[in-house]
Every structure is written in structure tokens, then in C-alpha cells.
From Swiss-Prot:
PANTHER family: MEDIATOR OF RNA POLYMERASE II TRANSCRIPTION SUBUNIT 8. GO terms for molecular function: RNA polymerase II cis-regulatory region sequence-specific DNA binding; TBP-class protein binding; transcription coregulator activity; transcription corepressor activity. Gene3D superfamilies: 1.20.58.1710, 6.10.250.2610. It comes from the Eukaryota. It is found in: Nucleus. Component of the Mediator complex. The keyword Transcription applies. This is Mediator of RNA polymerase II transcription subunit 8. GO terms for biological process: negative regulation of transcription by RNA polymerase II; positive regulation of transcription elongation by RNA polymerase II; positive regulation of transcription initiation by RNA polymerase II; regulation of transcription by RNA polymerase II; RNA polymerase II preinitiation complex assembly. It comes from Eremothecium gossypii (strain ATCC 10895 / CBS 109.51 / FGSC 9923 / NRRL Y-1056). Pfam families: Med8. The lineage of its organism: Eukaryota, Fungi, Dikarya, Ascomycota, Saccharomycotina. InterPro entries: Mediatior_Med8_fun/met.
Length: 223
């Protein structure tokens, strides 16, 4: 087994590295988001690989959490985009290259893995942008126009969604104008003014059990 010479150990101990420019906040925030997303995806994979599949509501809740974590990771990456683009990782002399050779290779890798290359190529093909015939300003302007169109479409969908009750065949505006039969279960909405009937009282139930007659308000008044 090879041993480190005392001279090299003394040289390493005498070196003082400056960590002030290391983007620790950005890296730690991204690490936490990636750890949460990895844990959620692993749990979904384990649940789906079991013989008994999880209940639909449990799977829906897990997917909702995963989508939220993915959105949070995307926002974090966009927030620290400038910092990550100008950050260049490199190993220190004390880095355990033998034990973490795979991690070192990943950090020093300049080319994307095949899965990422296919994902980027698919996104470029669907965007319809000609990257070779345009400069970066034109591409950035096209991306901003696409984001603006997406935002307007989302606002329109939310506005149209608010115009419908999704509990019947009438819109929210028609229900507010008392159009249709509010008593019908088909057209009843959450804002219907129809009131449910009062439940039977204990006295009415006991009277019906022992006398066979239903005690109502009219009979009680007549008596």
C-alpha cells in the first residue's frame, strides 16, 4: 500500500484555501431540493413496484407533492442561474479520488449525459427555434414572448374556470341570475338558496313507532 510522504502531508497542511467565493448558499439550497425530490421519486417507484398498488388518492397525493418539489427545484435553479453558470468545480489535493472517483468524474464532466442531451434536443425541436440562424438576443426575446403567451393563456383558463360551477349544466353567471330550477339536483350549485328539510324529531319517530301516525305541525295545531 502506498503511503503519503511526510513532506506532502506538511505541504497540504500548510496550504490555506479561500472558501469565501464558494456559493455555499446556492449549492446547499439545490442539494436540499434535489434530496427531497429524489426521496419522493424513490418512494413512488417503490410503491409502484409492489404487488399491491397503492390507493389512487395516496398516489395522487404523492404526485402532487412531487410536482410541488419539482417546481421548487426549478425556481431555485432559475434563482441561482447566474451563480451556477460562472461556477467552476475543481478538486482540492485532499479530495479522496480513489473512494469518490465516480463523483469526481461527474463534477469534472463537461458534456451532458445522453439522457440530458435527448431532453435538450427534444425541447429545442418542439420550440421551433433556429439556434444556428439567430443570435442570443433573438432567442431570449422569443422565449420571453412564449412565456408571455403562456401567462395570458393561463389567466384566460382561470377566468373561464371561475365562470362555471362544475356542479351542473348552468354557468355561475346564470345561477346568480336564478336561471333554471335550483331545486333540481342536476342544476343545484353550491350557491343555491334551496334549504334542506328539517329532520324528524325524536317525538315524531316514537309516535310513529307506537301509534302508526306521523306527528306533523298541522295535526299538532289542530289539536
Amino acid at each position: 500500500m502506498s503511503q503519503t510522504s511526510p513532506l506532502s502531508e506538511q505541504a497540504d497542511s500548510s496550504l490555506k484555501y479561500d472558501y469565501s467565493n464558494v456559493p455555499a448558499q446556492a449549492l446547499d439550497a439545490i442539494r436540499m431540493r434535489l434530496a427531497q425530490l429524489t426521496h419522493s421519486l424513490s418512494k413512488i417507484r417503490d410503491d409502484m413496484s409492489k404487488a399491491d398498488l397503492p390507493q389512487w388518492y395516496s398516489l395522487q397525493a404523492q404526485l402532487s407533492v412531487t410536482l410541488t418539489q419539482l417546481s421548487s427545484l426549478t425556481s431555485t435553479l432559475q434563482h441561482f442561474e447566474d451563480t451556477l453558470e460562472c461556477t467552476v468545480p475543481y478538486p482540492l489535493p485532499s479530495f479522496p479520488t480513489t473512494a469518490h472517483e465516480g463523483l469526481l468524474t461527474t463534477l469534472m464532466r463537461k458534456k451532458q449525459i445522453p439522457e440530458v442531451e435527448n431532453w435538450i434536443k427534444d425541447a429545442i425541436d418542439h420550440s421551433g427555434l433556429d439556434l444556428e440562424g439567430r443570435n442570443w438576443d433573438e432567442i431570449e426575446s422569443a422565449i420571453q414572448r412564449d412565456k408571455s403567451t403562456t401567462a395570458r393563456a393561463l389567466d384566460f383558463i382561470n377566468q373561464e374556470y371561475s365562470n362555471y360551477s362544475f356542479q351542473g349544466l348552468y354557468t355561475a353567471e346564470e345561477l346568480s341570475k336564478n336561471v333554471g330550477d335550483p331545486q333540481s339536483m342536476i342544476y343545484r350549485s353550491a350557491t343555491s338558496n334551496a334549504k334542506p328539510k328539517a329532520p324528524f324529531s325524536v317525538d315524531s319517530i316514537l309516535t310513529f313507532m307506537y301509534q302508526g301516525t306521523m306527528k306533523t305541525e298541522e295535526t299538532s295545531i289542530a289539536k
